[in-house]
Design a protein with these regions (language model features):
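Phosphate-binding and adjacent anionic-ligand microenvironments
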Residues: 1-103, 108-134
Length: 134
């Protein structure tokens, strides 16, 4: 992941500056860092590479944007990100290989698997329809 601070800095991600800012923020706290609540527990996939020929991958993403826009709240920055109350899924065209890149995260394993199934099924159909292998 990345973290950006736009105040008191140039507004790009910088790991060393991020660590220094966190140290500065927490140095003013009376409680130790161990008193902070833990990270939320979620189910998530690693980055999934779905084979998709270069010639059709951007058309597949375009179809995904139109399709999922009618079903869910979506963000179309760099692909399509489906946003649900219990999780999210991302589809984007790889810039370096003939593949679509997918990621899924949800509050539970079942919710993540449901979203993944819902998003992968039409992708496979569009890839086959446009001349790729599914």
């Amino acid at each position: 992941g990345h973290i950006f601070f736009s105040d008191n800095w140039f507004g790009f991600d910088d790991g060393i500056y991020g660590a220094a800012r966190f140290a500065d923020i927490f140095s003013g706290q009376e409680k130790p860092l161990s008193a902070l609540p833990g990270w939320p527990k979620t189910a998530k996939t690693p980055e999934i590479h779905m084979p998709c020929p270069d010639e059709i991958k951007f058309e597949v993403v375009k179809r995904a944007q139109a399709y999922f826009r009618n079903k869910y709240t979506v963000s179309e920055i760099d692909g399509v990100r489906v946003i649900r109350p219990d999780g999210w899924g991302l589809i984007r065209a790889s810039n370096t290989q003939p593949a679509l890149i997918l990621r899924f995260e949800a509050e539970t394993e079942n919710a993540m698997n449901e979203l993944r199934k819902d998003m992968e099924a039409p992708l496979k159909g569009w890839i086959a329809e446009l001349g790729g292998k599914s």
